[in-house]
From Swiss-Prot:
The gene is C22orf39. InterPro entries: Pants/Emi1-like. Its main location: other. This is Synaptic plasticity regulator PANTS. GO terms for biological process: negative regulation of long-term synaptic potentiation; regulation of synaptic plasticity. It holds the Pfam family PANTS-like. It comes from Homo sapiens (Human).
Amino acid sequence: MADGSGWQPPRPCEAYRAEWKLCRSARHFLHHYYVHGERPACEQWQRDLASCRDWEERRNAEAQQSLCESERARVRAARKHILVWAPRQSPPPDWHLPLPQEKDE
């Protein structure tokens, strides 16, 4: 990764442009504001797009490092949400019994 030969950005530059464009759309703004109560932060997508283009045009090592760090941060953010339910190893022992509302009838 130090010399950058053969290295490709994690996503094509067009993907960064599409994400930035989506982030700036009115529909995404309204959805994000409704769900999170704040404006969506689109600056990172714009920085990633600029870094990707800088890498493709000049093979800039700083742009490469910026893209790598940004993608790592995205992966960490996606992994930080834990499971709500613990996976079961086996079904409950009374799984075959009728449900409580079926007993009343």
